[in-house]
């Protein structure tokens, strides 16, 4: 596990204060991150001080009309040479210092595992429905799902969170990566394809 290179990829648009907190927490992970690739939409909204503060950042700017959930992530994956690519949203905040370590561990325990996603915890002041949805999509126990689980989970068999998910580069590339035209659910579309290989 120690020779595995990890890049974190974050599409961003007008990142706020929580973005700096996210980067800060990523730099303190127990498993080292090679670099954090930020795909920033609209350079006007980018805070250049972040690059001065965090040398681990590699920022690529694109215009708003160029952004696409699938294509932007696919482009970032092409920029990465890491063994594991962790895709996160700009508002995802690691709850602890072992996030990356746990994702890498999940990917390396079984050579057939191509993706792993982190548990998303609800905010304290969110609605009951949101808390219930989070507990269903992100149970407190890890699970490995395959197409054999379709009778149990239905379409949720292919659930993979775009908030925070890790992908093995070799499997990702073999499957062709994310679809280039996806306004949402690029992660789930990828997982459906992976499960049918």
Language model segments and positions:
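A recurrent flexible, glycine/aromatic-enriched loop bordering the glycosyltransferase active site
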Residues: 147-167, 183, 189
């Amino acid at each position: 596990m120690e020779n595995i290179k990890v890049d974190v990829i974050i599409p961003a648009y007008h990142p706020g204060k929580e973005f700096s907190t996210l980067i800060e927490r990523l730099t303190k992970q127990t498993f080292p991150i090679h670099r954090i690739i930020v795909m920033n939409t609209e350079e006007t909204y980018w805070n250049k001080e972040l690059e001065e503060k965090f040398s681990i950042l590699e920022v690529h700017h694109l215009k708003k009309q160029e952004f696409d959930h699938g294509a932007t992530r696919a482009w970032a994956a092409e920029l990465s040479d890491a063994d594991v690519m962790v895709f996160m949203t700009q508002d995802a905040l690691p709850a602890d210092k072992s996030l990356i370590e746990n994702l890498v561990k999940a990917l390396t325990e079984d050579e057939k595992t191509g993706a792993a996603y982190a548990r998303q915890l609800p905010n304290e002041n969110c609605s009951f429905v949101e808390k219930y949805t989070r507990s269903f999509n992100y149970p407190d126990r890890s699970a490995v799902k395959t197409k054999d689980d379709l009778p149990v989970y239905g379409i949720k068999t292919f659930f993979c969170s775009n908030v925070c998910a890790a992908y093995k580069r070799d499997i990702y590339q073999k499957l062709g990566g994310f679809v280039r035209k996806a306004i949402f659910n690029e992660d789930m579309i990828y997982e459906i394809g992976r499960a049918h290989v």
